[in-house]
A protein has these predicted regions:
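A beta-strand edge to alpha-helix "cap/lid" segment located at domain peripheries
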Residues: 1-33, 37-150
Length: 150
């Protein structure tokens, strides 16, 4: 399915969010592993497994044609030889949609965990789990602070 090679997990993550912004389902699915054991959970959604369910869910999300911008912040990355886990905050804005006061709509931030597996064809996403961020966004991490999730 995928002819693209992502030399690092960060390259795969960048390609995932770029495809989301462009509304390019094929480019987004090229980031995912071809394994049937992939998992995706959208905010408030059920657990989806396998290529068919994951692809169908993203096709529905991208079908309305809204152009979104995603700013990733608060990234914590943990990497090993064969696996990488990225915890991020996804900050969305929707272009062209206007609220009642004429300002861009800005949905609440989303916290997401993306898991990447190193394969013979480069790094591939195997898990994307996203949930609404509770309350206020946490402040940016300072240099030298611990990189511990819990």
């Amino acid at each position: 399915m995928s002819e693209r090679n992502y030399p690092t997990a960060q390259d795969a993550e960048n390609a995932f969010y770029e495809a989301l912004e462009r509304g390019d389902l094929d480019a987004m699915m090229a980031v995912w592993s071809e394994d049937e054991e992939i998992v995706c959970v959208h905010p408030g959604g059920e657990r989806l497994t396998g290529q068919d369910q994951v692809r169908m869910s993203w096709a529905k999300i991208l079908a309305d044609g809204s152009r979104v911008r995603v700013h990733i912040s608060h990234q914590v990355a943990i990497s090993a030889m064969m696996i990488a886990v990225h915890s991020v905050q996804e900050n969305f804005s929707v272009e062209g949609e206007r609220g009642r006061q004429g300002t861009d709509l800005r949905p609440a931030p989303i916290v997401a965990t993306n898991v990447y597996l190193r394969t013979g064809a480069g790094w591939r996403m195997i898990v994307h789990h996203a949930s609404p961020a509770p309350g206020k966004a946490e402040p940016p991490r300072r240099e030298g602070s611990p990189k511990i999730l819990h």
